[in-house]
Amino acid sequence: MKTKNIVQLPLENLEAPPHTYEAVILNKEKFIKVLTEIVNMDEINSIKNRIVILKAILSNYMKDQEGILNIHANGDTVSLRRNILIAELDKIVNAQTKERANYYLKRLIKGIQEVKTNKINDINLLRWKEYDDIITDSLWIFDKRDTSGAHLGWYWGNFIPQIPRQMMLRYTKKGDWVLDTFLGSGTTLIECRRLGRNGIGIELNPEVAEKAKELIEKEPNNNNVVSEVVVGDSMVIDLKSILDKYKINQVQLLIMHPPYHDIIKFSKNKNDLSNAKNIEEFLEMFGKVVDNATPYLERGRYLVLVIGDKYSKGEWIPLGFYCMQEVLKKKLLVEKYNR
């Protein structure tokens, strides 16, 4: 059925191309000019007509009479996710009033013209829908662990790379510093390299630390960041001297993935948390790690605790809850994620 004053284009011209998740590069100046012209239109139907034409252009460049896809050699461009852009245009087409249509138009213009980030990450809040790699749910379900590049999964008890990656994307910017007090196989520092974060990892076992260092060095360091592996006991190690080496006073993210008490014995070292005689001693040792590390965490930043519960002789022991209680004793606030 034809709606009065609204251009009716063939359905195939309005359908997004097969790769709807790909980016579309637009002439920024001309696209904003067109959107601004649409905002200044008096009639809602006229607004919808122009938006329908814009959608057709995004689906078929041969229809680009506006020059939106005409990129000059030195011209300013903007890259937008095609499916998200089309969804935003659909909201305008479906708007019931001119005021609502203009609201969506002005929001789109603002998202193109401005970049709005905050202190703790590089996410552009005006275009947050484009960050598909950041999980926004509190329950995380991963089909499988990331085994790409230097992530070999050789170390028994290491955590999946997606966890530190998610935390760094959420809570750090490029160039920030990340401290991992239980480095293990080097998972955190490998992700630091990939994301352009400086990383320091403390590992009690010298052999494990050496293997981790070898793997980390195999990961390309395209961002020229620091990847420091230090052999030591996180309960007592002099973190200040390590930070002084790089002329920094604090880190922006603290990651802890301690042993799940004695489920896996990682060494024979008496200072290894997996050798704690009982839960009380384990928590005391863990508390010392927290005490030693948190003074170097920048105020307002995050400590990431990754730990699971355990069963022993038919009894469920809520290690996660107990460890969070230890963290709370240090006056930190808890924000929980499940995986």
PLM feature spans:
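Class I S-adenosyl-L-methionine-dependent methyltransferase catalytic core
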Residues: M1-R339
